[in-house]
Curated annotation (Swiss-Prot):
Any one cellular-component term (Gene Ontology): cell periphery
Glycosylation: residue positions: N41, N86, N101, N151, N341, N349, N371, N528, N983
Keyword ATP-binding: yes
Disulfide bridge map: none
UniProt xrefs under SUPFAM superfamilies: P-loop containing nucleoside triphosphate hydrolases
Protein name: Uncharacterized ABC transporter ATP-binding protein/permease YOL075C
Organism encoding this protein: Saccharomyces cerevisiae (strain ATCC 204508 / S288c) (Baker's yeast)
Gene Ontology molecular functions: ABC-type transporter activity; ATP binding; ATP hydrolysis activity; ATPase-coupled transmembrane transporter activity
Chain ranges passing through the membrane: 376-396, 496-516, 531-551, 605-625, 1039-1059, 1121-1141, 1267-1287
């Protein structure tokens, strides 16, 4: 192959023609735009002006926090709250004439005819986060996006989807599921390209792209930008993107460049003028340096030392002044008069929208696809009513209707029919919405392709059969006959209709709750409190006739009152009669006591139907009004004064940091200074075996599929230098790091199979040994605690990882590390999450690195450490890593997508992987250049060597011809390396000849490097401090802990206060005692709001061997228990003192005690299920079933349970607490009147005092004994939770 043939692999390609219809051309004109954060009055972007004609590709460049994303958002009108802006932004429709001119390229013909110019102007926006459905394949995602955004024929849409798949290099993964953290699918780069495709499919005139190349390898990034350039040139589209690290050939594809630094414009003009402009002010781009990297370095402020910061800030100020002068004297912006006379288009009109019923059709089809591909949710959907119906039927199994207790049980089972199933569905559907559906809706709503009403209607249609109809039918079919209700078809189907409408109402309530807040802890609070009020108004717990007047009206707006009342009327009207006088029928008397009319059928059914529709209507209105937006970053003000410490002798802090690490008088450091570890991988293979249940009915229930991830990888990684693993997306780079660091985890449906050897200095080690001496920086930063600041995160990590140092030494090292990583400017900013914006993605990456750098390990693994970072920050991070290698002899291995050319030359060894994990090369950069030159692949001048090699090893799937030629090239390179390995006799050493470390010899040699966990007391104290800080800052967590329990007490007080001493008050006291079981659910919900984030952070710390399970568990309890105790005291104030139960010290403290214990048991159950399952939707479903069964078995609902169920009740805390509360509620000295009912024939009262009630209902218990037992039950719950966590992490390891 000649140099001419291979010289420019990236550009010698066959061009595709995309079948997009013509679009109107749009130009963008901005004048004096300034963007200010309204909360802090901080200027985020200062005086930005430009003219961008149609057919242009513009890039906004700059370091992290320079205002790139903010500028894009304002230009696209994506941020309204939290920001104010001055200046003008105008979109102008350019006059292109009715026919294309001769210079324009010819267009493809669709459906055999030439399409006219599209009338509707469309704008698209690619956000920084990829919001995709994990259970759709790549092709399905694009197909549904096309169906939602294009009003074209099926053939046209299919053609465009296939062309985009090829153009974006997604052909190899077109039928792969997108996946998520739990179920791996597409790589990060593939997801990014797919997101670009979902926006491009709408055929936009103007498109904004926020970091489109983040996570892409250099070759994929180049092809994506090349596609944008082609679309701009051919169709006159306008593309505006923010970009971190454009390779040099990407830079020269751009038409216009804007460089920002700290919100100030450093340059904003045509790309052709960029280099001459900087040369004119004295800055010449050095040879063999990417101009983009040079310009970003030039305009960045280096905050790693005071001296550097002052110098670079001064240079930046000079650059800004130069640009203002140039803009005023040389830049020729179009006159305002021209813009004013042109046709201006409002951005609100630049959205795509199908007719309503087409939206509904597409969304329904997608929902069906998603629902039936989610096996776990589908199974639980049908299992839940089956289990809960069976157990509920067993609890209330055919009660004796001739006794008072039996009739009370019958009433309770009717209440359970209306409330139980629909409440469980409310919780489940709320979580399913928060976890899966609403994020996709928010993205599509922001794009203008979906309306709230279409979303709600489509979702309801798709879930109607499986959820509303099937779940209700299963539940009613089981419970109706087990309850021993009348075998009448009309009554059976009427009960089905009532329960069906109740579940429909709860479905609407869940939609309303999520419309109010996308955060589950808030949405569940809305749903829970609403449902609690509605269940209180149903008339079962507190008699609807005698409710306090100020809440009596609630029954008329409570669908539960209508549903419970109509079932009571259907069951008891003219029933249990012993005489012809209907008024004396026991059933009619019960209806009279509860205040429901006889034969009350039609009206409540109609009202129920109205409520079921009404909740959805209110939810739709809130969704229309409440478009989700992200708030501006929050800053936590430090209480301490900021003391700037000057570096002695002007030494840079990162050098001081490195000196501190090993020059302190620490025995570990002195020993470790000279340890050098050469890592050798021999014949590493990795494959994953997928077991897909129910995927192919013909082949059986399970379908097995094997995927090769790594194949015979042999590599050497040397100490004292950075070793890089390079390759295109999907080549197994991250998988190799996970394998050698012992972080591969098999699941039920995906088993990893590995083989090969890992050597330390030619002696074989196990994965566990490797893990003990290495630190691993993962690609994912989601485990960071959102409520902590940067400084706090590193401070707490240092306290646990550097426990051999004094506090002053730890603080100094933390401060130095913050400066070294360039985080000084945001050290007091919170980390943030998807709901509250904190630091940028690049800054999160550096925080994660900082935590691991504190460990000071001999081996450091980093997965994509520069992904999402600007070139200046990337260079800074790699400079820090290089110093660690050089001065401390560490072995550092990184995976990297787009290394700068000057950094690539400084790498130690490079492992180049092709797709499917096959080795293309392993050696030094100089050896690499020489090797590929021998193969005939000479790197052209002014080309980044790393980019060139990545281009060589990448397969271009944009069209068949490109694919054939690129695959042949890749196969040739792979075959050549295999032959080279064989010739050099580098085959692996036979297993029998390998030296292997024993466990003892390894720990003897590397004992000073094996991380020793912090002692229990220290880890406990640090965990308490950290969790206290996160709880204090997180309003949601605090409210979940403190507000929900007293909130219930307030509601109970509203409905029950004052509890009287008459016949009706008996059922009210029973109801109030039964309502205390709701605290079981509150404990679980509090756990769901607080525990998962703490758990995820703890798992990372545990994997790093920082501390054990006990400190985390005890610290969590230390914060949880006092807050629960405080909430329980407030609860008792409302339920005992306000409601008017016996106001004695014994009753008050017994209520505090019982409510505290029940809440703690709910928390413990939450810990158990959150440990078993990491998927919260499944957790909610499982735990809700357990809790519901527990509350139904409390002993106050069903008064005649079987002996087996009574046996289960021994470990049911609410079984004990309900009995304690009811015995204190009916003391022997409580005198009852019977003017309103309950008189014997001789005129005496059936229940003269509290003891009579307890005896009659069989509720007399030894309260002292029960008070002792429930402590034991609570302790048993906690111990079970602890041992389940221990089993997960230490014993079984699932």
């Amino acid at each position: 192959m000649s140099q001419q043939e291979n010289g420019d692999v990236a550009t010698e390609l066959i061009e595709n023609r995309l079948s997009f219809s013509r679009i109107p051309r749009i130009s963008l004109h901005v004048r004096d735009l300034s963007i200010v954060a309204s909360k802090t009055n901080t200027t985020l972007v200062n005086t930005f002006s430009m003219d961008l004609p149609s057919g242009s590709v513009m890039a906004v460049m700059g370091g992290s926090g320079s205002g790139k994303t903010t500028l894009l958002n304002v230009l696209a009108s994506k941020i309204s709250g939290g920001l104010t802006h001055n200046g003008s932004i105008r979109y102008v429709l350019e006059d292109t004439g009715s026919e294309p001119n001769e210079t324009e390229p010819k267009r493809a013909h669709l459906d055999g005819q030439d399409h006219p110019i599209q009338k509707h102007v469309i704008m698209a926006y690619l956000p920084q986060q990829d919001v995709l459905s994990p259970r759709l394949t790549c092709r399905e995602t694009l197909k549904f996006a096309a169906d939602l955004k294009l009003n074209s024929s099926e053939r046209t849409k299919k053609l465009m989807v296939e062309q985009l798949i090829e153009e974006l290099g997604l052909k190899d993964c077109a039928d792969t599921l997108v996946g998520d953290n739990s179920h791996r699918g597409l790589s990060g780069g593939e997801k990014r390209r797919l997101s670009i495709g979902t926006q491009m499919i709408s055929n936009p005139s103007i498109m904004f792209l926020d970091e489109p190349t983040t996570g892409l390898d250099a070759y994929s990034a180049f092809l994506v930008i090349k596609t944008l350039k082609k679309l701009a040139k051919e169709d006159g589209r306008t593309f505006i993107m923010s970009i971190h690290q454009p390779r040099s050939d990407i830079l020269f594809l751009l038409d216009q460049v804007c460089i920002l630094s700290k919100g100030n414009v450093v340059y904003c003009d045509k790309m052709d003028n960029t280099i001459p402009y900087f040369e004119s002010i004295g800055y010449h781009v050095p040879q063999l340096v990417n101009p983009a990297d040079y310009f970003i370095d030039l305009s960045s402020v280096d905050s790693r030392s005071d001296k550097e910061e002052a110098a670079t800030q001064s240079r930046l100020n000079s650059l800004i002044d130069h640009w203002h002068d140039y803009e005023r004297t040389h830049l020729q912006l179009q006159a305002e008069s021209y813009i004013s006379n042109a046709t201006e288009i409002q951005i609100q009109n630049m959205t795509t929208r199908l007719p309503f019923w087409k939206q509904v059709t597409v969304l329904t089809r997608r929902n069906f696809k998603l629902n039936f591909s989610d096996y776990v949710t589908l199974i639980s959907t049908f299992a839940e009513p089956l289990i809960i119906g069976t157990v509920c039927g067993w609890i209330y199994y055919k009660p004796d209707k001739s006794s008072i207790g039996g009739l009370r049980t019958t009433t309770a089972c009717l209440y359970a029919s209306t409330i139980l199933q629909c409440y469980l569905y409310l919780l489940f559907d709320t979580y399913r919405l928060c976890e899966q559906d609403i994020a996709l809706y928010d993205r599509e709503r922001a794009e203008g392709s979906v309306t709230p009403l279409a979303f709600i209607v489509a979702r309801k249609i798709s879930l109607f059969l499986s959820d509303d109809f099937a779940m209700t039918m299963i539940f009613v079919s089981i419970t109706y006959f087990m309850f021993g209700l009348e075998a009448d078809a009309r009554k059976f189907f009427y009960q089905f209709a009532v329960v069906f409408l109740c579940q429909l109402s709860c479905s609407g309530l869940s939609m309303l709750s999520v419309a109010v807040s996308r955060d589950f802890s808030k949405a569940s609070l809305v749903g829970n409190m609403t449902f609690t009020v509605l269940s209180m108004g149903c008339g079962f717990f507190v008699n609807a006739k005698v409710m306090p007047v100020y809440v009596r009206w609630i029954k008329y707006i409570a669908f539960t009152w209508y549903s419970f009342g109509t079932l009571m009327s259907s069951t008891f009207t003219n029933s249990y009669c012993t005489t012809d006088n209907l008024d004396e029928c026991l059933g009619n008397q019960i209806l009279e006591v509860y205040g429901f009319p006889r034969n009350w059928i039609t009206v409540p059914a109609v009202v129920l139907l109205c409520w079921s529709v009404g909740y959805f209507v209110v939810g739709a209105i809130i969704l229309y009004l409440h478009k989700i937006d992200i708030t501006l970053q929050n800053e936590v003000k430090s209480k301490q004064k900021k003391i700037k410490k000057k570096s002695p002798t002007g030494m840079k802090p990162e050098i001081q940091l490195l000196d501190d690490v090993y020059h302190q008088k620490d025995l570990e450091a002195e020993k470790g200074k000279n340890i050098h570890i050469t890592i050798k991988l021999e014949d590493i293979d990795l494959r994953v075996i997928f077991s897909a249940p129910f995927s192919n009915w013909k082949e059986g229930n399970f379908h097995h599929e094997t995927k090769e991830i790594l194949q015979s990888v042999n590599a050497i990684f040397k100490p004292g230098m950075i070793n890089a693993i390079m390759g295109p997306s999907g080549s197994g780079k991250s998988s190799l790091l996970n394998l050698i660091s012992g972080r591969l985890k098999s699941s039920v449906f995906a088993k990893f199979d590995t083989s090969g050897s890992i050597m330390f200095n030619d002696i074989q080690v196990s994965e566990l040994m490797f893990k003990n001496v290495c630190s691993y920086v993962s690609q994912d930063d989601d485990h960071l605690l959102a409520a902590l600041t940067v400084k706090e995160t590193l401070k707490y990590a240092a306290a646990l990882r550097l426990h051999h140092l004094t506090e002053a030494e730890r603080m100094e090292r933390t401060d130095n590390l913050i400066r070294s990583l360039g985080l000084k400017h945001c050290e007091n900013n919170i980390i943030g999450n998807e709901f509250v914006k904190g630091i940028s993605g690049g800054e999160k990456r550096r925080v994660t690195m900082g935590v691991q750098l504190l460990n000071d390990p001999p081996i450091l693994l980093l997965d994509e450490p520069t992904s999402g970072l600007d070139s200046f920050t990337s260079a800074t991070i790699l400079e820090i890593l290089e110093k660690l290698c050089r001065e401390q002899g560490k072995t550092i291995i990184i995976t990297i997508h787009q290394p700068r050319s000057e950094l690539f030359k400084r790498f130690g060894n490079v492992l180049l992987l092709a797709k499917s994990g096959r080795t293309a090369f392993n050696g030094s950069p100089d050896e690499m250049i020489a090797y590929f030159t021998e193969l005939g692949y000479n790197c052209p001048s002014f080309t980044n060597v790393a980019d060139f090699f990545l281009d060589l090893i990448s397969v271009n799937t944009q069209n068949e011809q490109n694919e054939i030629s690129s695959r042949a090239r890749v196969e040739k390179i792979l075959s050549a390396w295999k032959a080279n390995m064989d010739n050099e006799s580098l085959s692996p050493t036979p297993i029998s000849e390998k030296q292997q470390y024993s466990q003892e010899s390894f720990f003897t040699e590397y004992s000073e490097f094996v991380r020793k966990p912090a002692n229990l007391v220290l880890a406990y104290i640090v965990n308490v401090k950290r969790q206290f800080t996160t709880t204090r800052r997180s309003f949601d967590s605090l409210m979940a802990r403190i507000a929900q329990i007293p909130g219930l007490g307030v509601i109970f007080a509203l409905f029950f206060a004052p509890v009287k001493h008459n016949y009706t008050s008996i059922s009210n006291r029973l109801g109030l005692a039964q309502e205390s079981t709701a605290l079981y659910f509150v404990g679980m919900l509090g756990n769901l709001a607080c525990y998962p984030t703490e758990r995820d952070y703890f798992y990372e710390e545990y994997n790093d061997n920082v501390y054990g399970i006990a400190p985390f568990f005890l610290a969590y309890m230390t914060l949880e228990l006092p807050l629960s105790a405080l909430a329980s005291v407030l609860y008792a104030v409302f339920t005992v003192l306000a409601c008017g139960l016996p106001r004695t010290a014994g009753n008050f403290f017994a209520t505090v005690y019982c409510s505290f214990i029940v809440t703690c048991c709910g928390e413990a159950l939450g810990i158990m299920t959150n440990t078993f399952f990491e998927r919260p939707g499944f957790v909610v479903n499982c735990i809700s079933i357990i809790l519901s069964i527990g509350t139904q078995m409390s002993g106050l609902m069903s008064l005649g349970m079987s002996r087996v169920l009574k046996g289960f009740n021994y470990l049911n805390p609410v079984g004990y607490t309900s009995m304690i509360i009811i015995n204190f509620a009916f003391p022997g000295n409580l005198k009852l009147t019977c003017e309103d009912g309950g008189k014997n024939s001789d005129g005496t009262c059936e229940f003269a005092n509290g003891h009579d009630v307890l005896v009659s209902y069989g509720l007399v218990r030894n309260t002292q004994k029960y008070l002792g037992i429930i402590v034991c039950v609570a302790i048993i719950y906690r111990l079970i939770a602890f041992f389940i966590l221990k089993a997960k992490l230490e014993w079984i390891k699932w």
